Design a protein with these regions (language model features):
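Catalytic phosphate/metal-binding cores of nucleic-acid and nucleotide-processing enzymes, i.e., regions
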Residues: 1-194
Length: 194
């Protein structure tokens, strides 16, 4: 019989998958028996598994078909030491971030989605995703920590775009499509094409 904590975690994963399905109009599901199938000590499995299998077992949520680079880890806990976000290290959050990054590939859009009893729901994304809007957020070790509903209201389209494409590296001859550019639409298209 699963523990109450495992049941709580699985329920939160299903809730997140259902919410993402509603937002994007495509099916997101909880990874069956989620729990580091290709992360942690099982990272070696990436060497011999097909890319489609890796995408399926990465994180806690199997993303819809248009978002192959979305990597989501979900956490549901009784409490969280919010005051430590401003005053020092949050070892629990560091562990969770490491779990996300442990199964991540270079081009993934990594997210940590959390829920705490009587405290609310939150999202943390990496700083490298610079195109996101926040009404309020806290930056913790290169991750932006913000309120769940507000995050999705402001950023659902950007998350779809950034998790749908493999991000190109900036080189001397080409600007990255993920690099912010300023100017007219025609200039942006010209910059990307050259």
């Amino acid at each position: 019989m699963p523990s109450k904590q495992k049941i709580k975690g699985a329920t939160w994963e299903r809730d997140v998958a259902k919410h993402l399905t509603e937002i994007y109009g495509e099916t997101f599901i909880r990874v069956p028996h989620s729990g580091a199938y290709i992360g942690g000590s099982n990272k070696v499995r990436k060497q011999y598994l097909h890319e489609g299998v890796i995408r399926t077992f990465k994180g806690d949520i199997i993303p819809g078909p248009s978002m192959p680079y979305l990597n989501v880890e979900c956490k549901a806990y009784k409490d969280f030491p919010f005051h430590h976000l401003l005053t020092g290290d949050v070892k629990l959050l560091d562990e969770w971030i490491n779990q996300v990054l442990d199964s991540a590939d270079e081009h993934d859009f990594n997210m940590l989605i959390m829920k705490f009893n009587r405290k609310g729901k939150y999202v943390a994304i990496e700083d490298k995703h610079l195109h996101h809007k926040f009404k309020r957020h806290i930056n913790y070790k290169g991750w932006n920590f913000s309120e769940y509903d507000q995050f999705w209201k402001l950023n659902s389209k950007t998350v779809r775009l950034q998790s749908a494409i493999k991000k190109r590296q900036i080189n001397y001859n080409m600007k990255s499509i993920t690099q912010p550019t300023f100017g007219s639409r025609r200039q942006v298209e010209t910059n990307i094409a050259t």
